[in-house]
C-alpha cells in the first residue's frame, strides 16, 4: 500500500495552533507527501513518508487529512483511541504505549539538503529512537483478540 497526498497546507481557520489542508488551493502553499506502508499492527500502521515539499507539520497534517493521525499526536487527535474496541484491556495497552512513547510517533530517518555556500548535497541518516522502537515492538506483540 502506498500513495500520495497533495493539498495546500496553511494555518487552520479556527485553531491557529494547527495547520490544515486546503484542497481547493485557497490558502497556504502546495505540499506533496508520498507514503508507503511498512508494517501493519492491527489498529496502527508503520509508514514511511517522503516529502516533495517542506511545510510546517506537513506529515502530521497530510496523515490526518487522509484519516490516519500519527500515534500519540495530541495536536492533531492521535492521542485519542479512535479505532479498535472499547475494551478496558485494549485501552490499557494503548495507554501503556503512550507512556513508552510520550510524544507523537514521528521520526526523521533521513534529512538532506544542498549546502548554501558550497552547493554540496548533504545527507544525514538516523536510526529509530529507543522509545519508538520499544513502542513498535509492543504493537508487534499485541494480538487484536487478546
Label the model's feature ranges:
Residues 1-146:
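RNA pseudouridine synthases
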